[in-house]
């Protein structure tokens, strides 16, 4: 998984560059966000809507993510390093809920092929 690799690299570089150059290295896991790159992903609008409804604070916008990144450059976070920081309105910590179950009950028929198998991607 590419994200796991990126997080591992950040931890390794965070240790090396932290010790040798006092540099902090972190990753940020953002809410689903509408971007040019993401516009070609099938079902992105539904993923965005699902995450927005499931997140206690809703999805974070691209501008809010930019603000969060700016905060990470401040001296107020000078001891934060080698971390994957979630900026997703709480979505990553939400388990199954009544709201999620109601969403799943609606079915995935539009994401199935002619044999009834779910199409991933």
PLM-predicted stretches and their roles:
Residues 2, 10:
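Active-site helix of classical SDR
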Residues 15-19, 78:
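Alpha-helical segment proximal to the catalytic Tyr-Lys
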Residues 20-34:
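Glycine-rich nucleotide cofactor-binding loops and adjacent beta-alpha elements
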Residues 23, 27, 45-80, 85-89, ...:
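C-terminal helical subdomain
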Residues 31-43, 96:
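Short beta-loop-alpha junction of Rossmann-like oxidoreductase domains
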Residues 92:
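Residues immediately C-terminal
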Residues 95-107:
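A short, polar/charged loop-to-alpha-helix boundary motif
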């Amino acid at each position: 998984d590419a994200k796991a690799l990126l997080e591992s690299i950040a931890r390794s570089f965070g240790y090396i560059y932290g010790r040798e150059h006092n540099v902090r290295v972190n990753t940020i896991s953002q809410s689903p966000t509408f971007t040019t790159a993401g516009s070609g992903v099938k079902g992105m609008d539904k993923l965005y809507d699902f995450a927005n409804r499931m997140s206690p604070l809703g999805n974070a916008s691209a501008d809010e993510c930019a603000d969060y990144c700016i905060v990470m450059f401040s001296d107020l976070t000078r001891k934060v390093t080698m971390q994957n920081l979630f900026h997703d309105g709480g979505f990553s910590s939400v388990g199954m809920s009544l709201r999620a179950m109601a969403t799943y009950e609606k079915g995935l028929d539009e994401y199935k092929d002619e044999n009834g198998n779910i199409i991933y991607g």
